[in-house]
């Protein structure tokens, strides 16, 4: 005799027979805790009819959730970092124009233009929050201690293998969850295996909107030419 456990509310296919209703994946069903004994001979002799049940609506991501997921790791300061183990991928929202500056308008988690004044109302000094930057790269906006935006943005892509690096506010540095690389609060590498500091972008305000512009000058953190512009 074989013992199976049935679930009374499994959102999958349910099979019925003259002997009752049961889920085809009997060995995997656990919620119901109802033990039923069925002999191998009876199982072989059953005539089964399967009927698919619908997935509850609250299990299906709505459009806003799916669009938000298209922006990789935005708002990562307040979220767990486990999901950041995925390799870096570009945002799916097309980068915005830079109002004739040659740059890109920063986008928030919903794909909206970042308005500098509004951003500063909701982000405290020392805050580092991801936005969409140049070429769609995830880029940190930095709020200085005097509650102004820093003149630079920090590209969040790890220089080791391309994971998106979260900012650890408790330790005041960026720590990559993939292989442990660490960067100081300005993105300068302080521990490998990452070989280089995080890339920079100029952060300007044009017509009230935050604009990222390519950084081609000396890296102020290292005193060297910017490797990302080579």
UniProtKB/Swiss-Prot annotation:
Signal peptide from the UniProt entry: none
Protein's name according to its UniProt entry: Cytochrome b6-f complex iron-sulfur subunit, chloroplastic
Binding site for [2Fe-2S] cluster: 158, 160, 176, 179
Disulphide bonds in the chain: 163-178
InterPro entries hit by this protein: Cyt_b6_f_Rieske (IPR023960), Rieske_2Fe-2S (IPR017941), Rieske_2Fe-2S_sf (IPR036922), Rieske_Fe-S_prot (IPR014349), Rieske_Fe-S_prot_C (IPR005805)
Entry cofactors: [2Fe-2S] cluster
Species in which this protein is naturally found: Spinacia oleracea (Spinach)
Highest taxon in the source lineage: Eukaryota
Compartmental location: Plastid, Chloroplast thylakoid membrane
Enzyme class at the top of the EC tree: translocase
Keyword Transport: yes
GO annotations of cellular component type: chloroplast thylakoid membrane; plasma membrane
More about this protein: This protein is 1 of 2 subunits of the cytochrome b6-f complex that are encoded in the nucleus. The Rieske iron-sulfur protein is a high potential 2Fe-2S protein.
Topological relation to the membrane, as annotated: Single-pass membrane protein
Keywords tagged on the record: 2Fe-2S, Chloroplast, Disulfide bond, Electron transport, Iron, Iron-sulfur, Membrane, Metal-binding, Plastid, Thylakoid, Transit peptide, Translocase, Transmembrane, Transmembrane helix, Transport
